């Protein structure tokens, strides 16, 4: 067994769950959950679920903003002539549809990207910026392939650039901390 990649020697055999104390059961459960969350299927599922939740909130917010503009489609102009109850029913129905649609898209994209990135990282056995860029390219091309090769190329470039920008931003905190609070 290893601890952060360092071999710690032979471990005692695992006891059956019935023979463990409550603390040992909790530690074993936490160990198994962490092991699952660090695996590729675990990362993929977590990215899909969190993308679904984030997409749902984003879709709900964007749908609520759609009724705020005075210039809109004929459907929005037509809504203002209906009674209040029908207006609310139509708006909430539309918000639910948009929210669900956005949630599905965010969840799907997050799941595909995370799965591809984890697979590339496992195959390369390296954790660097090229994993995210490659995963972004594959994900972008895969999502746009139905529209043709040019769209796949643009999708590849766009997702790779976005992934590079996000990775560069998230990895920029690796600098040493400032000497005092005034030099931030």
From Swiss-Prot:
Q: Does the keyword Hydrolase apply?
A: no
Can you name a GO cellular component term?
plasma membrane
Q: Where in the cell is it found?
A: Mitochondrion inner membrane
Q: Where is this region: Disordered?
A: 1-26
Which InterPro entries does UniProt cross-reference here? TIM22
Arranged from A to Z, the UniProt key words for this protein are:
Disulfide bond, Membrane, Mitochondrion, Mitochondrion inner membrane, Protein transport, Translocation, Transmembrane, Transmembrane helix, Transport
Physiological role: Essential core component of the TIM22 complex, a complex that mediates the import and insertion of multi-pass transmembrane proteins into the mitochondrial inner membrane. In the TIM22 complex, it constitutes the voltage-activated and signal-gated channel. Forms a twin-pore translocase that uses the membrane potential as external driving force in 2 voltage-dependent steps.
The similarity annotation says:
Belongs to the Tim17/Tim22/Tim23 family.
What protein does this entry describe? Answer: Mitochondrial import inner membrane translocase subunit TIM22
Q: State the gene name recorded for this protein.
A: TIM22
């Amino acid at each position: 067994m290893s601890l952060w990649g360092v071999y710690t020697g032979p471990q005692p055999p695992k006891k059956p769950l019935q023979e463990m104390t409550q603390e040992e059961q909790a530690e074993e459960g936490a160990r198994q959950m962490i092991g699952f969350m660090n695996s590729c299927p675990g990362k993929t599922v977590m990215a899909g679920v969190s993308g679904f939740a984030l997409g749902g909130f984003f879709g709900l917010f964007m749908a609520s903003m759609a009724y705020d503009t005075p210039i809109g489609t004929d459907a929005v102009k037509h809504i203002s002539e209906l009674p209040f109850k029908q207006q609310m029913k139509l708006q909430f129905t539309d918000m639910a549809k948009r929210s669900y649609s956005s949630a599905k898209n965010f969840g799907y994209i997050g799941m595909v990207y995370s799965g591809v990135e984890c697979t590339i990282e496992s195959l390369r056995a390296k954790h660097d910026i090229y994993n995210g860029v490659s995963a972004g390219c594959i994900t972008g091309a895969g999502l746009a392939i139905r529209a043709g090769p040019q769209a796949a190329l643009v999708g590849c470039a766009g997702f790779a650039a976005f992934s590079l920008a996000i990775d560069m931003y998230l990895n920029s905190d690796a600098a040493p901390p400032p000497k005092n609070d005034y030099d931030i």
